[in-house]
Amino acid sequence: MITIEQLLDILKKDHNFREVLDADEYHYHYQGFSFERLSYDSRQVDGKTLFFAKGATFKADYLKEAITNGLQLYISEVDYELGIPVVLVTDIKKAMSLIAMAFYGNPQEKLKLLAFTGTKGKTTAAYFAYHMLKESYKPAMFSTMNTTLDGKTFFKSQLTTPESLDLFAMMAECVTNGMTHLIMEVSSQAYLVDRVYGLTFDVGVFLNISPDHIGPIEHPTFEDYFYHKRLLMENSRAVVINSVMDHFSFLADQVADQEHVFYGPLSDNQITTSQAFSFEAKGQLAGHYDIQLIGHFNQENAMAAGLACLRLGASLADIQKGIAKTRVPGRMEVLTMTNHAKVFVDYAHNGDSLEKLLSVVEEHQTGKLMLILGAPGNKGESRRADFGRVIHQHPNLTVILTADDPNFEDPEDISKEIASHIARPVEIISDREQAIQKAMSLCQGAKDAVIIAGKGADAYQIVKGQQVAYAGDLAIAKHYL
């Protein structure tokens, strides 16, 4: 429960309070209300709910619906003049985060918080950390792919970083479940829209940066994207940073006065020898490590997670066992066809991750290589040119372009846009299952491979704003082995 007095105190301390308006009267102090629930969904309110009127598309009609359901007061950046009191604020998203934090009893103070950011590798690194910490502790995890609040039950995540009301409710449930640590992926969007406003992480990890999520509804420029990624460093007590990432020198200067550790070839913590399923490291993680996920970049992600978990109480033995046990649904999943050709299913969904995926497969498969690829609609439009550039640099690839969450766009138009950046013919088959079936039918022997990129373990396609059932790349590939 939270009272109106507590609510106003939070807003005033954050310099985010304007006034309470009630029947055209302005109030600096206000009393007589307490709230047992928080909501930003007008369909889920009653007389004891504090309702947040948020979003660029919010309509007064939503508020009218809430009032008919018993709503007595709301918080907003706008007075909708509907006859009930309104708490007016300058920034609704910041208000949501701080009020949710207090309402749920400050659960962040009862958990060790580890956050990963980066253009790619966040989910894999989060899974490595989860398995490392699980050896001696009780970690919860919020990842792009799956969420677990008790370490036993996993459910599909809706956002990389949940809305603040949901985030702190879930954190409180983690505390109730006896969890000791929470591992999170923190997106640039989470900082852009203040989902984690006021939250300080025990360790923040910056894996890498490359142009992505740049478009009309995301970040307008790379500078804006990079800036919002860097906010994790400002909001972490200690940081772990990749020494060979782009703009590393800037980050090194930024974190010079806080606890930090670097990893990678230009640091004291680096991989000295690397095999397909093992590696040796020196520095704080000195030793031998077995790993199931192929690719040097996955070994680097394991190093990043290991250094973070070492700071959070994990032993070297915990880290070794955790790395050896880690598998990630939809990340470098490998199948073998009856003719011994390989099928690789991976979530690679931007130019950088596609380049790394192709390079790993080409190390092991030297025959015919088929690539199945698409790009999402209405987001990350810059990826399309990036995909074309990467494909152009791998002339031995045979490419079939297909649907990948087309949303409100025509998947064939998206494919044509990707194709416009490739200086050789490619095939377009918008039906993703048909594209996979054809690619697999063209592979004949052990040196051949099909690479299915983009959707990973997702069992849906986003079409016209809705999640439409889709069997999943791995399930479809298994069907045609």
Swiss-Prot record:
Broadest EC class assigned to this enzyme: ligase
Alphabetical list of InterPro entries matching this protein: Mur-like_cat_sf, Mur_ligase_C, Mur_ligase_C_dom_sf, Mur_ligase_cen, MurE/MurF_N, UDP-N-AcMur-Glu-dNH2Pim_ligase
Binding residues annotated for UDP-N-acetyl-alpha-D-muramoyl-L-alanyl-D-glutamate, in chain numbering: S42, Q158, T160, T161, S187, R195
Catalyzed chemical reaction(s): UDP-N-acetyl-alpha-D-muramoyl-L-alanyl-D-glutamate + L-lysine + ATP = UDP-N-acetyl-alpha-D-muramoyl-L-alanyl-gamma-D-glutamyl-L-lysine + ADP + phosphate + H(+)
Post-translational modification summary for this protein: Carboxylation is probably crucial for Mg(2+) binding and, consequently, for the gamma-phosphate positioning of ATP.
CC terms in the record's Gene Ontology section: cytoplasm
Keyword annotations of the record: ATP-binding, Cell cycle, Cell division, Cell shape, Cell wall biogenesis/degradation, Cytoplasm, Ligase, Nucleotide-binding, Peptidoglycan synthesis
Gene Ontology terms describing biological process: cell division; cell wall organization; peptidoglycan biosynthetic process; regulation of cell shape
EC number: 6.3.2.7
Primary subcellular site in the record, as a coarse category: cytoplasm
Oxidoreductase found in the keyword field: no
Modified sites of kind N6-carboxylysine: K229
Residues engaged in binding ATP: G118, T119, K120, G121, K122, T123, T124
Pathway(s) the chain acts in: Cell wall biogenesis; peptidoglycan biosynthesis
One GO molecular-function entry: ATP binding
Subcellular location: Cytoplasm
Chain span(s) of sequence motif L-lysine recognition motif: 404-407
Gene3D superfamilies cross-referenced by the UniProt entry: Mur ligase, C-terminal domain, Mur-like, catalytic domain, MurE/MurF, N-terminal domain
Family according to the record: Belongs to the MurCDEF family. MurE subfamily.
Function: Catalyzes the addition of L-lysine to the nucleotide precursor UDP-N-acetylmuramoyl-L-alanyl-D-glutamate (UMAG) in the biosynthesis of bacterial cell-wall peptidoglycan.
Family annotation (NCBIfam families): murE, PRK14022.1
HAMAP family listed in its UniProt record: MurE
Annotated protein name in UniProt: UDP-N-acetylmuramoyl-L-alanyl-D-glutamate--L-lysine ligase
The species this protein was found in: Streptococcus pyogenes serotype M3 (strain ATCC BAA-595 / MGAS315)
